[in-house]
From Swiss-Prot:
Its cofactor is Mg(2+). Keywords: ATP-binding, Cytoplasm, Glycolysis, Kinase, Magnesium, Metal-binding, Mitochondrion, Nucleotide-binding, Transferase. It is found in: Cytoplasm; Mitochondrion. It is an enzyme of class 2 (transferase). AMP binds at residues 213-214, 218, 237, 312, 343. CDP binds at residues 212, 217, 236, 337, 342. It comes from Rhizopus niveus. ATP binds at residues 213, 218, 237, 312, 343, 374-375. This is Phosphoglycerate kinase 2. Pathway: Carbohydrate degradation; glycolysis; pyruvate from D-glyceraldehyde 3-phosphate: step 2/5. Pfam families: PGK.
Length: 417
């Protein structure tokens, strides 16, 4: 799966065409009101581009929440239609369903640059292909899925996918729209462009910074990165599993230890040596007497070890300096996983200092990519937008790409040639 060879909305002639755009309008809501419209704002450049380039109609489809394959009023996209209308500055017609004869008729007769928002795709079990009933999963009927996908296909002439955050899911709206031109929108294109820079043709030295809790959860990620990078910083909770297994530290107290992951550590270290990948671990820690924002804090080094009733919740100043040196040597940097429990102020400095070093490296010309999820949350919290090359919008999707997996929603896009 080449990331850099996918058809983009810029490659298409949109004049007098109906354009079906899969957006990600999965926005937080409270009492029927949108509490953060960022995802809607991010989708607008693709919508505006289609309108500015003569599309006869733009039809938007999205999911919201987890309604489990049935219509649930609190997950209706109706409030989103009003927000899109406000931000676009033009009327948006909201349809009460996303498939079926009435929806097909409304979309097929739309002209003059009309904008339509369909109701939540996940109100139908056929979107995700299954639903949870009590403790078991019920699969959607294959014939019904085919019909659902055919109805989505009937809505437009061209399909555009701008929902990178759902690209790792083989849902009907991601892989089942059978139009001859299936292109990436601007958000999707930017994600593919930057991940291609890292995974297909990185400027070197190439550094990965991997944090998070469990080695066993990140095994595929570490394995895949060891095949690609020149150096790897291991931080966050999973560093303790490495350090204890390799006897690099006297004792780790109550710090996270991943028993299953510990069995994989020696092979990973061996692979790093074979591939000539430099491994960098923290050497000192900010410790806590409990896992809480109001915990008493302490300090420990590898040589001292962490006392029995204490746990490491962040890396210390010496580690931050080590990490900074490695970051500033690098020309391509991918960061996935914070280096401490940044949600608690007392244990946020390690993650903050990694972020500052990544920003510094960006200024010096490095390509810097921050994976989605917690790392993106931390980066946005401290105002890094525009100061690093790319902050991914997809937690699970970016992780799977970095693990070397194919994303169904990307595979389904047309290639340029």
């Amino acid at each position: 799966m080449s990331l850099s060879n996918k058809l983009s909305i810029r490659d298409l002639d949109l004049k007098n065409k109906r354009v079906l755009i899969r957006v990600d309008f999965n926005v937080p809501m409270k009492d029927g009101a949108i509490t953060n419209n960022n995802r809607i704002v991010q989708a607008l450049p693709t919508v505006k581009y289609a309108l500015d380039n003569g599309a006869s109609a733009v039809i938007l489809m999205s999911h919201l929440g987890r309604p489990n394959g049935e219509a649930v009023a609190k997950y209706s996209l109706k409030p989103v239609a009003a927000e899109v209308e406000k931000l676009l500055g033009k009327p948006v017609e909201f349809l009460n369903d996303c498939v079926g004869p009435d929806v097909e008729k409304a979309c097929q007769s739309a002209t003059g640059g009309k904008v339509i928002l369909l109701e939540n795709l996940r109100f139908h079990i056929e979107e995700e292909g299954s639903a949870k009933v009590r403790w078991s999963k019920v699969k959607a009927d294959a014939e019904a899925v085919k019909k659902f996908r055919a109805s989505l296909t009937a809505l437009a002439d061209i399909y555009v996918n701008d929902a990178f955050g759902t690209a790792h899911r083989a849902h009907s709206s991601m892989v089942g729209v059978d139009l001859s031109q299936r292109a990436a929108g601007f958000l999707m294109q930017k994600e593919l462009e930057y991940f291609a820079k890292a995974l297909e043709n990185p400027a070197r030295p190439f550094l990965a910074i991997l944090g998070g809790a469990k080695v066993s959860d990140k095994i595929q990620l570490i394995e895949n990165m060891l095949d690609k990078v020149n150096a790897l910083i291991v931080c966050g909770g999973m560093a303790f599993t490495f350090k204890k297994t390799l006897d690099n530290v006297k004792q780790i107290g109550k710090s996270l230890f991943d028993e299953a992951g510990s069995k994989l550590v020696r092979n990973l270290v061996k692979k790093a040596a074979e591939k000539n990948v430099k491994l960098v671990f923290p050497v000192d820690f900010v410790t806590a007497d409990k896992f809480a924002p109001d915990a008493n804090t302490g300090y420990a080094t590898d040589a001292d070890g962490i006392p029995d009733e204490w746990e490491g919740l962040d890396c210390g100043k010496k580690s931050s300096e080590l990490f900074r040196e490695e970051i500033l040597k690098s020309k391509t940097i991918v960061w996935n996983g914070p280096s401490g429990v940044f949600e608690f102020d007392a244990f946020a400095n390690g993650t903050k200092s990694v972020l500052n070093a990544v920003i510094e490296a960006t200024k010096e010309g490095a390509t810097t990519i921050i994976g989605g999820g917690d790392t993106a949350t931390a980066a946005l919290k401290w105002g890094a937008e525009g100061k690093v090359s790319h902050i991914s919008t997809g937690g699970g999707a970016s992780l799977e790409l970095l693990e070397g997996k194919e994303l169904p929603g990307v595979t389904a896009l047309s290639s340029k040639n």
